[in-house]
Amino acid sequence: TEAGAKRALKLPMSVPAHCKLMKPASEKFKEVLNSINMQEPKCKVIQNVNASATNKVETIAENLISQIYRPVRWTDIMNSLNELSLSKCFECGPGKVLSGLMKRTLKDTEIISLDNYESFTNKDNFL
């Protein structure tokens, strides 16, 4: 194609995530997020808004709000993860689609999908 894509896939989606149509939802989410006392994570978090690693709570919160209506920077995220030479990488959220995609790119990294309560409480995932 003109944009250089090799192939395009239709992904089933229940909401118009990561686009401007979700801006009103992000405002409501901001209200909820502001009522939560977030603690600084013990590891760095890479979010889809800017593809950079941080453990600053304020930045993580701002990015969580923005990622509802802003595009995912998948290639940038994969490049950032590759540069970190990680032994383990976690996908947080429902489903395992992204974990599958990550395994193709991060071949030397163990990819763990944290998509339910059991996966979050299984200590073996974090050793």
Segments the model singles out, each with a brief description of its role:
Residues T1-L127:
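Acyl-group transfer acyltransferase/transacylase scaffold of fatty acid/polyketide systems
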